[in-house]
Amino acid sequence: INNMEQMGSLFVDYKIVFFYDQSSDNTLDITLERMKSNNKIFVLVNGFHKRVKERTHNLAHARNKMLDFVREKCSNYEYFMMVDGDEVSSSKMDIDVLKRTINRKDWDGITFNRAGEYYDLWAMSSKRLVLSLWHFEQPNTSTIFRDEIYHEIRECKEGELIHAYSAFNGVGLYRTKKFIDSKYDGLPRLDLIPPFLIERTKEILKVGIR
């Protein structure tokens, strides 16, 4: 919450919206207590949607509910953010990176690399590896994907962006006008991916690690 409030302070106004499903700790109690000192915090509680075994479907439901909130309460905001509410997003953030990013015009949606190992491999779809690593048999696929992503990061010059079809990594910033009508379904959409990109991914996996 501290990080979210710090990010929110960069804007003229902000709202922090949590979607609460279930947890084994005191997440909800902590959030409700924080609401007493910050009236910009809102909690949406999952009361009717039945959780399913597919994690992506549960995430899609939660994010769609938050997008509904954006459409109803914040449609005039220039940006909205999606942030994982776990320990990954609780570590110290370089707020200056976000400041510089807001002033750039060369992105519609952007996520941020982190110091250390890239943890959100399953959500990554790059120009060379357009399919998720979970479309392929393990155990070597994760290593190949990780090697490719680190190669792109090493080759990226300071100030440049890495183009991606999909990425998250815990914090995402989106231009509201571009994504206001978006909806998550949690389903694989191979019909949206050009066949040559699928074949490119397969070829890279055949060759293996750089």
Predicted features along the sequence, with ranges:
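Short, acidic, metal-binding catalytic loop of nucleotide-sugar glycosyltransferases
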Residues: 2-13
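Phosphate/oxyanion-binding active-site loops and adjacent basic polyanion-contact surfaces
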Residues: 1, 27, 54-63, 206-208
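A solvent-exposed, charged loop/short amphipathic helix patch at secondary-structure junctions
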Residues: 184-209
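Alpha-helical elements of Rossmann-like donor-binding domains used by nucleotide-donor carbohydrate transfer enzymes
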Residues: 3, 30, 61, 65, ...
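A conserved acidic beta->alpha catalytic loop
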Residues: 19-31, 47-50
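Conserved catalytic core of nucleotide-sugar-dependent glycosyltransferases
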Residues: 87-190
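Short beta-strand-to-loop acidic/aromatic patch adjacent to the donor-nucleotide binding site
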Residues: 68, 74-90
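Conserved donor nucleotide-binding strand/loop of the catalytic core
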Residues: 32-72
